[in-house]
């Protein structure tokens, strides 16, 4: 799903809107959902999304590092998620779901900016990592806001299955 969507978006944006710097991506959304449900496995959509984006855009090797390594910075949220799980269990509220989305987006884009700096990018170009992702940011936050209402979507998978088992035992 990720690879097909990214391919369609890249094809459409380069053909129909070649002068526009904006794009939309599923990577932050999938990363966030997988991060909540399965933890470190969120690295897979982060890496695959970065590799695929770079491949489709004909990027040079340093850009592969920027996107693949930069996309992984939100993994730093794993200790926070562990403590949140113990206290709350899920991200079913509006503020927690959107707040987590904002944190993932900022860390992902900040990670790309940081890796770019390490490769010698001009610091004046760094705001572009945040501004070109505006459509992706809005898309991610709106979908997370919707997903929070679906039972178990923004909940640790083990916690969700245990909760279901307990609910079935009570009924």
Name what the model sees in each region.
Residues 11-21, 60-70, 80-171:
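Membrane-embedded alpha-helical hairpins and interfacial helices in multi-pass inner-membrane proteins
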Residues 1-37:
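Hydrophobic transmembrane alpha-helices
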Residues 45-67:
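Membrane-helix boundary elements
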Residues 31, 71-80:
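Alpha-helical transmembrane segments and their membrane-interface exit regions
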Residues 3, 7, 50-51, 71:
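Residue-level recognition of pore/gate-forming positions within transmembrane alpha-helices
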Residues 8-9, 33-34, 53-56, 77, ...:
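Residue-level signal for alpha-helical transmembrane segments in multi-pass membrane proteins
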Residues 33-47, 85-89:
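Membrane-helix interface "capping/anchor" motifs
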Residues 1-6, 38, 100-109:
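Alpha-helical transmembrane segments of multi-pass integral membrane proteins
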């Amino acid at each position: 799903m990720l690879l097909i969507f990214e391919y369609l978006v890249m094809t459409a944006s380069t053909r129909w809107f070649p002068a526009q710097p904006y794009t939309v991506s599923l990577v932050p959304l999938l990363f966030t959902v997988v991060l909540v449900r399965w933890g470190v496995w969120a690295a897979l959509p982060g890496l695959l999304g970065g590799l695929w984006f770079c491949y489709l855009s004909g990027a040079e090797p340093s850009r592969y590092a920027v996107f693949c390594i930069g996309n992984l910075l939100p993994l730093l949220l794993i200790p926070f998620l562990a403590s949140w799980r113990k206290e709350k269990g899920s991200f079913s509220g509006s503020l927690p779901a959107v707040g987590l989305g904002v944190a993932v987006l900022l860390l992902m884009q900040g990670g790309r900016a940081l890796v770019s700096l390490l490769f010698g990018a001009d610091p004046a170009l760094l705001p572009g990592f945040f501004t070109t992702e505006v459509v992706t940011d809005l898309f991610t936050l709106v979908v997370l806001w919707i997903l929070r209402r679906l039972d178990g979507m923004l909940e640790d998978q083990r916690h969700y299955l245990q909760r279901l088992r307990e609910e079935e035992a009570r009924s």
